[in-house]
Amino acid sequence: QTLNRLYTAFATLDADTMATCYAEEATFDDPAFSLKGRREISGMWHMLCAATLTKNRADWRLEFSEVRADDNSGNAHWEAFYRFSVSNRLVHNVVEADFIFTPDGLIASHTDRFDFWRWSRQALGYGGWVLGWAPYFQKQVRVQTRAALTNYLAKHP
């Protein structure tokens, strides 16, 4: 099943296998990223997995549960434990994921929901506590993650 393959690969930071779970024209949305196409989604997973493998592998752990899917859609609960590379702070992110599948079982749409303010307080400390609730701050995070992904994709075509 696609979702078990995705999260099993994520747990071991295997971005190559994760990328094979997505359709060519897939979309991905969460509070930090809004992506279109397998290239961008694959690039995000490769960028995040590479950063964790390089800098903070010992702090990484992923747990997933409540994986449900039929031929058309699915959902899962997952929790990531990691060290945020920008601040070197430990984060425990709790995520609910929703999926829509193509007829051949690949992910056409992937939406992750998590409490952005909770995440920002853990990842950024005081600054996240003060600003993490503000839509402007979340927009700025999206701008920064988009720039980081664009830079990564330029270096890893």
Where are the regions that the model predicts?
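Short, low-complexity N-terminal intrinsically disordered segments enriched in polar/charged residues
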Residues: 1-20, 24, 146-157
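A general structural-boundary detector
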Residues: 5, 28-31, 85-86
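Hydrophobic alpha-helical core bundles mediating ligand binding, dimerization, or RNAP-core interactions
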Residues: 3, 10, 22, 45, ...
